[in-house]
Amino acid sequence: MSAVDEWVHNANECIEIVQVNEKHEKDCQYHPSNTYAIFGDAEVIYGYKDLNVTITYECPLMVPKLEISYSERLAPDSGVEPTDIEGTLNTYLKDRSIKVEGNSFDVHSANSIHNYSFNGKTFKILQATVLEASEIMQHLQIFSLFFIEGGSFIDLNDPRWMVYLLYETTEDDYCLRGYCTVYKYYKWDKLIHDGIRARISQFVILPPFQHQGHGSQLYNAIVSTFLKNPKILDFTVEDASEAFDSLRDHCDYKRLLSMGIFSEPDFHPSLSRQWINSKIAETKLTQRQFSRCCELAFTTKLKKLSLLERKSVRLGIKERIFRQNLDVLLQLDKSERIEKIHNAYENQFDEYKQIVKKLPKLKEDSPRKRQKLAQSSS
């Protein structure tokens, strides 16, 4: 290590997040994934030797305490100003713009929408407006910077924001494992004048608890509230990451499968517009996501389809690609446009083949139904 390197530290590595329960016993610890929004693109803290930065969060309301230790700090006459760690982090650790409600947010009496068990442990998902949960939300804003690529603060004074909090629970403790924020947009509908489009915005499962099924539990619980609310007409996702897209595909596909959508007589490669519209209204998915789930379903049984049915699937995917990229594609000449669409189809199909390896297979159609489907595709 050079003399200069001793004074330079990667912020992601030297910042440690520690959660403690209400008895101040350590619950878990982890590091942020991103700090560029706080310390710049290089994610570097400069001017200290043997630096350790610990942010201790006390559950259940995630009240933070910042501790900084080092063996030596650059002298004022060195000509280089060390990073103001405390001043910089304190800017983000608490959102002071929010009007914290007078009553404390009580996790024990908050609206619980789903409970489940995993590895002998109990988990609970709570639902609240960000105003109701202002006491915890003022401390969670920084987590969108730590764990979401391109994440940013949301307006916690806007009553249209909802938050869903995932806790691991015992008789005495509630320890945070993840959270999701949802914004309720107005959506016009001729039958429902105060219709809502729900948009999933921030979705975070804390690092020690990822890849354990908690993301699917949280997503499915949230979607369940959408489906039960007659004012919510559909729901979408804001700037989803690749990992979240994968989670979403798996959850939405399995939900449609359990609803029997893929077993209906009208579900065949030549889907009618009337059937698609009715199922979009029923599932509250966007047209793009519903089409994607249907395409995944056809891919799971592609080998069992006739040549004519496979062609219908292929043309359906290409038509969707064309519609989604209409403005760009219309600027190309016909031959180049056809090539672009075909290449996009090949990439999409390769992605589907990887996804369906982890999806449950559809039940094979009876010979009588297969004959009917083949005839309807001709």
Swiss-Prot record:
Keyword Secreted carried by entry: no
Gene Ontology cellular component annotations, sorted alphabetically: chromatin; chromosome, telomeric region; cytoplasm; histone acetyltransferase complex; nucleus
InterPro entries found in the cross-reference section: Acyl_CoA_acyltransferase, GNAT_dom, Hat1_N, Hat1_N_sf, Hist_AcTrfase_B-typ_cat-su, Hist_AcTrfase_HAT1_C
GO terms assigned for molecular function: histone binding; histone H4 acetyltransferase activity; histone H4K12 acetyltransferase activity; histone H4K5 acetyltransferase activity; histone H4K8 acetyltransferase activity
Enzymatic reactions: L-lysyl-[protein] + acetyl-CoA = N(6)-acetyl-L-lysyl-[protein] + CoA + H(+)
Protein EC: 2.3.1.48
Acyltransferase keyword on record: yes
Chain positions of site Interaction with histone H4 N-terminus: 161
Interaction with histone H4 N-terminus, as annotated region: 41-43, 183-185
Enzyme class: transferase
Family: Belongs to the HAT1 family.
Entry function: Catalytic component of the histone acetylase B (HAT-B) complex. Acetylates 'Lys-12' of histone H4 which is required for telomeric silencing. Has intrinsic substrate specificity that modifies lysine in recognition sequence GXGKXG. Involved in DNA double-strand break repair.
Assembly with partners or alone: Component of the HAT-B complex composed of at least hat1 and hat2. The HAT-B complex binds to histone H4 tail.
Name of the protein described by the UniProt record: Histone acetyltransferase type B catalytic subunit
Organism: Schizosaccharomyces pombe (strain 972 / ATCC 24843) (Fission yeast)
